[in-house]
């Protein structure tokens, strides 16, 4: 499918630089492809058309007792590193690296800038600027150089010692569309983290989850909505542009995830008794769809997934999706177009832009019903 079909114009002022306060006061666009045609309209109590405007705190009224929300409990780490590259004893040059996937106790895949300056065998001293050392030695060797600035870094430290050094030296890797407008600050350490984050390893937040508050959790509990947690460590590749002209030619980035046997069994039980699987965020959806068999049964999962969902994909397990508003030409806009329908999502985004919804990581949310349900 042509990538330019997923393009659209977004005014700069629609990009959110800070989250709504409180978190669940963000707007919620409910997108129900079936509402106008009638047969499924009763499943959306307040929606008289395919698109209806609400707030995140209204979420319980769109769900039924016995439905299950699936959250990604990954925790963002300060994965943005600044350092000095050394080669053959010569003077150093400043470089930056964004860690995006751990591949061993001391090894990480990272995106380095400027990538052209880096070669295999280079040494990088992170936490240093010129001759000054800020926070101890976090040194690495460039073990391998790939495409698009990707490198494999072998750190001198390992295990918990490496984690502590990264936490001391690193910065929260704000998405490029925010970082281009303002620097990271102390507020982002809290704002760019879900309230239920517990499994360290992400370099980008599962942003749909940023809208949840203790009060919203209490309302969902009262409504009989189940909560289940899976883990997908979101990588920096989520921000990579699609450079191919056709979706068939795009190579999807890998992200590592985990679905326990217990959670798989609980979600299958929800489906068996007629409940719906409602994924909070595209990351939990991609993980659940990776773990699901052709029969729709969810299996335990541990490993990397590079699932790339575009229109024509047949969803196996997920019934509804809550997600933020995504970038033009992005793999995530392709995913939501597959989920609720290409024309439906183009109309939804046109409506969101014209009525002042806030886009991207700190922006508003949408609740999507699956087009083939």
Swiss-Prot record:
Any idea of its EC number?
A: 2.4.99.17
Query: Which SUPFAM superfamilies does this one have?
Result: QueA-like
UniProt GO MF annotations: S-adenosylmethionine:tRNA ribosyltransferase-isomerase activity
List the InterPro entries hit by this protein, alphabetically. QueA (IPR003699), QueA_dom1 (IPR042118), QueA_dom2 (IPR042119), QueA_sf (IPR036100)
Q: Which UniProt keywords apply?
A: Cytoplasm, Queuosine biosynthesis, S-adenosyl-L-methionine, Transferase
The alphabetized list of GO BP terms reads:
queuosine biosynthetic process; tRNA wobble guanine modification
Per the record, its GO cellular-component terms are: cytoplasm
Q: Which family does it belong to?
A: Belongs to the QueA family.
- What do we know about how this protein assembles, alone or with others? Monomer.
Q: What does this protein do?
A: Transfers and isomerizes the ribose moiety from AdoMet to the 7-aminomethyl group of 7-deazaguanine (preQ1-tRNA) to give epoxyqueuosine (oQ-tRNA).
What HAMAP family does UniProt report for this protein, alphabetically? QueA
Give the PANTHER family listed for this entry. S-ADENOSYLMETHIONINE:TRNA RIBOSYLTRANSFERASE-ISOMERASE
Protein name per the record:
S-adenosylmethionine:tRNA ribosyltransferase-isomerase
- Per the UniProt record, the source organism is Rhizobium etli (strain CIAT 652)
Identify the taxonomic lineage of the organism of origin.
Answer: Bacteria, Pseudomonadati, Pseudomonadota, Alphaproteobacteria, Hyphomicrobiales
Q: Which gene encodes it?
A: queA
């Amino acid at each position: 499918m042509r990538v330019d079909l997923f393009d659209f114009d977004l005014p700069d002022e629609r990009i959110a630089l800070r989250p709504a306060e409180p978190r669940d006061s963000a707007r919620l666009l409910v997108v129900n492809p079936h509402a106008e045609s009638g047969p499924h309209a009763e499943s959306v109590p307040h929606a008289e058309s395919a698109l209806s405007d609400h707030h995140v705190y209204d979420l319980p009224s769109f769900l039924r007792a016995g439905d299950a929300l699936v959250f990604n409990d990954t925790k963002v780490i300060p994965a943005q590193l600044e350092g000095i590259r050394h080669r053959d004893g010569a003077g150093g040059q400043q470089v930056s690296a964004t860690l995006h996937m751990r591949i061993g106790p001391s090894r990480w895949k990272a995106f380095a800038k400027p990538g052209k300056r880096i070669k295999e065998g280079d040494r990088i001293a992170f936490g240093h600027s010129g001759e000054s050392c800020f926070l101890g030695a976090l040194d690495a060797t460039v073990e391998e150089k790939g495409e698009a600035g990707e490198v494999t870094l072998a750190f001198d430290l390992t295990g918990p010692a490496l984690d502590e050094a990264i936490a001391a030296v690193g910065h929260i890797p704000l998405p490029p569309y925010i970082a281009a407008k303002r620097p990271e600050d102390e507020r982002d350490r809290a704002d760019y983290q879900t309230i239920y984050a517990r499994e360290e390893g992400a370099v980008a937040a599962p942003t749909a989850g940023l809208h949840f508050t203790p009060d919203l959790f209490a309302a969902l509990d009262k409504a009989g909505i189940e909560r289940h947690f899976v883990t997908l460590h979101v990588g920096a590749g989520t921000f990579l542009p699609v450079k191919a002209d056709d979706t068939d030619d795009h190579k999807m980035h890998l992200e590592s995830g985990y679905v326990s046997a217990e959670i798989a069994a609980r979600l299958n039980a929800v489906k068996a008794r007629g409940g719906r699987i409602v994924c909070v965020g595209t990351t939990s959806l991609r993980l659940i769809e990776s773990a699901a068999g052709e029969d729709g049964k969810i299996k335990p999962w541990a490993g990397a997934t590079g699932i790339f969902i575009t229109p024509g994909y047949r969803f196996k397990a997920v019934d509804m999706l809550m997600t933020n508003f995504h970038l033009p030409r992005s793999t995530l806009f392709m995913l939501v177009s597959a989920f609720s329908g290409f024309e439906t999502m183009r109309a939804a985004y046109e409506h969101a832009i014209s009525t002042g919804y806030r886009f991207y990581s700190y922006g508003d949310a949408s609740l999507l019903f699956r087009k083939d349900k």
